[in-house]
Amino acid sequence: MKLTLVRHTSLDIASNICYGQSDVDVSAQFDAERQTLQTKLSKFEFDAIYASPLQRCHKLAHALCADASLGFAATDIQIDPRLKELHFGDWEMNTWDAIPREIFDVWANDYANLAPPNGETFTQLQLRAKAFIEDVSSHLHGKNILVVTHGGLIRALIAEVLQMPLKGLFRITIDYASVTQLEFKDEIPKVHFVNH
């Protein structure tokens, strides 16, 4: 199974805001970013499309399906809550500077195992991403799947495929409207490309 992971387009929010699972809308650059993405995706054929339920992903999936080149209708989009971004709990919609430095630093040193208050750990995010992969591959084995999701989830899946510690996640750049492709075949999953 090939998994083509698309990160949502840029957002209508200041860059210093922690947003995670908050349902933030897309920016004014949405149409231009979507067109560029559509061109990138036109090189591939897909058998199914999945998206996070957050509007920044759902909107993009709908817009991509509106172009007949993908071969999907909006009704073909399968929404899966396991594809959501990391839940930052009480930190959501606060500026990063508003989070007490001593608390943030402890979390930043072990975000794989520590959660923001009322949030989740990156390990929990990775586990739900893996559960999604296992479910989808059980009935779409050998197929090409398009997934519209978030940077944190894409990084967690790359870490899983490369068997790297989650501590190194933020060494991987995943830009808005970028494409990453992973393959789950046989015993050894592979990274085909990242942040294209």
Describe each PLM feature range.
Residues 86-97, 138-143, 159-196:
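Acidic, low-complexity terminal tails and accessory targeting/binding regions
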Residues 70-130:
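Phosphate-handling substructures
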Residues 1-4:
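Extreme N-terminal starter segment of soluble prokaryotic enzymes
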